[in-house]
Each structure stands twice: as structure tokens, then as C-alpha cells.
From Swiss-Prot:
GO molecular function annotations of the record: acyl binding; acyl carrier activity
Cited PROSITE patterns: CARRIER, PHOSPHOPANTETHEINE
Primary gene name: acpP
Protein name in UniProt: Acyl carrier protein
Major localization listed first in the record, in broad terms: cytoplasm
Length: 80
């Protein structure tokens, strides 16, 4: 799976979970500051990414995922 394909899937999960327009989901976007997520939203977001990609993301690793780019790079490394 290419980085672009991962980004498209991540974008869809984020847009759905955070109820934001897909155009607002850029690589630079921060979940809390830019996309309006709260701590519960971020937990649901991580769970959505786990389901979408068939991964398990530990709480420690999840805390490091703060931007869309963080999520894409993490998933790419895990799938790699």
C-alpha cells in the first residue's frame, strides 16, 4: 500500500470520526488544535484506524500520533 493510499484511508476515517470535511484533513493537520478533536475523539480515532488497517496501536504509541502525518507514517511503518 502506498503512502497516498494510506493517507486516503486515514483521511476517510478522520473525516468520519471527527465529523469534519475531508478537505480539512491535510497531512499537517493536528487532531486537537486543527480538527477540533477532544481526548475521547482521539481514542475513537485510534480505534477506527486500528479497525481500518487491522493494527493494534498501544496507548503509548497512540499518544505520539498527534497529526495526520504522524498517523500515516506510523501505519506505513507498521504495514511496511
Amino acid at each position: 500500500m502506498t503512502e497516498q493510499e494510506i493517507f486516503e484511508k486515514v483521511k476517510a476515517v478522520i473525516a468520519d470520526k471527527l465529523q469534519v470535511e475531508p478537505e480539512k484533513v491535510t497531512l499537517e493537520a493536528r487532531f486537537i488544535e486543527d480538527l477540533g478533536a477532544d481526548s475521547l475523539d482521539t481514542v475513537e480515532l485510534i480505534m477506527g484506524l486500528e479497525d481500518e488497517f487491522g493494527l493494534e496501536i498501544s496507548d503509548e504509541e497512540a499518544e505520539k500520533i498527534r497529526t495526520v502525518k504522524d498517523a500515516v507514517e506510523y501505519i506505513k511503518a507498521k504495514l511496511g
